[in-house]
Structure formats: structure tokens, C-alpha cells
Amino acid sequence: MKKLLMFPLAAAMAAAVCAQPLPSASGGVNTGLAPIGEMAAPVPSGGNTGVAADADRPAPPPLLAAKSDTPFSVNALFASYKPSIYQVRTINSATGQKTSIGSGFIIGDGTMLATNYHVIADAVNKEKHVIEYIATDDKEGQLRLLAVDVIHDLAIVAADHNLGKAFTLGGVPEQGEALYSLGNPGDLGFIIVDGINNGILQKSARSRILFSGAINSGMSGGPTVNKAGEVIGINVESQGNDIGFLVPASHLADLLKQAESGAVNINESIADQLIEDNNAYYAPFFTNSWKKTTIGHYTVPTEHGGDLRCWDVSPQPELEDLAASESIICQSDRITYISNDTQVGRMGFVYSNFYAREPMPTARFYHLYSNEYHLPYEMRSRRDFGDFACTADFVAIGGKPFKTTYCTQPSKKYIKNGEAISDLYLIAAQIGEKQQGFTITVMLTGIQENLGKRVMAHLLEQITWQAN
């Protein structure tokens, strides 16, 4: 199973990594990152959800129709579900070798398999990549992609023939209920891992069930079932030490409706999903009350009750350092996997109070302060993203003058109504003080620009200055 790695935004936006420059002007990018002291001119429909068997699909295995007085048996679970679990592989047809493997299970009319999007992502994003299955009896076959849900890391693929008995989808069980995670990882064959439902994660941007069981590598996309045999979640991630995460089956039921409704343009569907998710995620930013803290002369917004977390990242100055700073970083745990090269949905911002430890000449201070004026950024493939476009300006924040640089990098693939999903970056540095400065850095990835500008403006509007 591919574990979705969170980008270390704290490290990327902290000084050691932020020193990485943007592409040079010689590459055609005008960043506007001049020294701070240098002044510039101001400037879906219905369908079968798979929740029950019907006349058009094979009867479910016996356990799927288990009654309350039927004794539970792991042996029966093993026998009933083994034929309905498949290994799903993405193959580079140019080499004949796999680039990823995971698990899948039969849903819908019996020709479909559910799996994780990240298991088959190479087939979406790369040429000459195809999707195949291996059954528990070692039979192999080709699969075609029907629909994806990148927000919840789900995909539905299909064969051109019936694969077997379909699973039934169920709801989230009571906290503490026993669950059984199934998969066909690597060359190990069909396995069952038992664990406990610990409920839906509360302070997270993603709907996930916390599962206390050892979801193993290659089990991504496999089902987790209750004692009645209903799929309550799809294996998606593991953090080790018997901590696993499941996507609630309700999201798969929604995707199944889309898959059954007809052909889907995958890139258009992904763009729609990203836009809809951004709108829902950022709506509370404009309505919720924000926690605030004071750093230097500024009172700044930090958390607002969602998944944002803030940390102190103040560097410890060396004895010989002429200047020092106190810094706060706030970032969300939200991430949407598109490919190994592209993960979007991140939101983070840094406040830094920079000051002279002892009085020094103004020119010397501004030289040191200018080193703080740089932007973090994601390395993007030129195949998938356009060039950076940056503008410099002078604005008032908290009643004080700031120099700003704002940069965008648009996606070439995910565009709707003329607006691309883009990465947005902003740095603002206070100017006019001789021995003290203040910087604000904001990073939003995979967002429509109009919404991103509103988010940045709302954040900056809440900042106030006061004399100590």
C-alpha cells in the first residue's frame, strides 16, 4: 500500500528550506523579490448503490445476509470473501512491469472492482500505463477505468466479464465494534486483519475511520467489513503501530452511482471535485471565529476550529548572530493525492518577527532582513503546470506599510469555466522600521485563484498592530 506522505510544510516554509529561490528571471519568471529596502512603484443522478443485491446481480455470499442469530466465524469469513478480493496493479506497457499494486473488491453488477485512486493513478497521469487484476486463483485480466474520487482516494475499474459476487456496502458501525480488513497484498495472497472501529476522525479535513489494526502494504483499496459482512470502509492508509485509516463506504456508494451513470471525462471530473472540495473546505474560514495570538507588535489569526494546527518554529540564535526572530507556522492536515509528482490542497502560513539583537546601522539591518524575503514553493512538472507569474505591490496590513510579492502557477489539466486550479504564494514584509521587521508568508496549493485571493485577503484583514 502506498502511504500518502504529508508534505513537510513546516520545514518547507521555515528558513532553512525557504531559502530555495524561485526560478530565476532568466527562465522568464519575474518574481519581484527585490531587496526589501528597494522601493518600486506602488502598484449525480440515481443508480444502484450496491447496498443490496437485486435481480440483475448475483446473490451475495452467505455472510452478507447474516442474521443476528448466525454465529460469527472467521473461517466462514475467509471462505466467503476470498474469491471476491483481487490484486489490482498498474503496469507500464512499455516495460511490462508494475508501477503500483493494491487490492480491490467486487461491487455493483459484478464486473466492477473498487480500489484506491492512488493505486491506479499512474494510468490516469502517464502514457502507456494500464490496469490489470490478479484473482486469488492467479487468473489475470485487463481492467478499464470508470470513475475516480481523488478527494476520498477512491476509484472504480471494470472488467469486460463478470468477476464474481459483489459486496454489500454498509454504514459506519458503533465505536468499539470489531472489524475485519481484507486484502490481497503482493504475493502473499488473501489475508484478514482484525481490529477495532475507533470512530470518524474529528479534527481532520478528510472523512476517515480510525481503525486499530495492522493494515499491511498492498492492502490499499481492500474492504473492511463488520461481522455481518458489510463493507463499512475502504483501506487507504497506515501509520504503523496498528493505526490504520479507512474511507467510509458511503463515499464509494456515491462514486458507484457516477460509474453506473455512463462515461466520465476523468480530468473534468477531477477539476469538479477539487473545486467543490475547496469551496466546502474554505467556507468556514469566512464565518468561524479565529483564535489569535500576539507576536512582536502584531496580533494575528491562527486557528479557527478546523484542522489548522499552529506551532512555534522560532530559531535559536547563535551567540554571534546580530539579529533574531520569533516565528509561528500554521498548517492544515489536508492533502489530495493526484500523482507522485502532484499533491494539492495544502494550506499554510508563517508569521515571523525579525529584530536586531543590538543596535546596528540601518543598511546592515536591511541586508539581514532582506534575506528573510523569499517564498516556499512546490516543485511542479512543466508537463502539468504552467509558468510562475509574480507581481510586486505595496499594501497596508494592520495600518503599517508592507511590500508584497504574489505568485501563481496554474494547472494545465484541471480547468473549469476558464479558471485553472492553481498554486498561490504570498510574502509580505513590513517596511520603514530601522531595527525591526515582520514577515507573513502564505501558501495555498490546488485552489481556484479567485477563492485563494479571498482566503489570503481575509487572513490579512484580521491582523492588527499595537505598540508594546
Predicted regions and their residues:
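Secretory pathway targeting signatures of secreted, lumenal, and periplasmic proteins
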Residues: 308-364
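Catalytic-histidine neighborhood of serine endopeptidases
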Residues: 101, 108-151
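Catalytic nucleophile loop of clan PA
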Residues: 105-106, 214-235
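N-terminal activation segment of mature serine protease catalytic domains
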Residues: 22-27, 32-103, 264-314
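Flexible, gly/ser-rich surface segments that form the specificity/activation loops bordering the active-site cleft
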Residues: 119-124, 165-208, 216, 236-245, ...
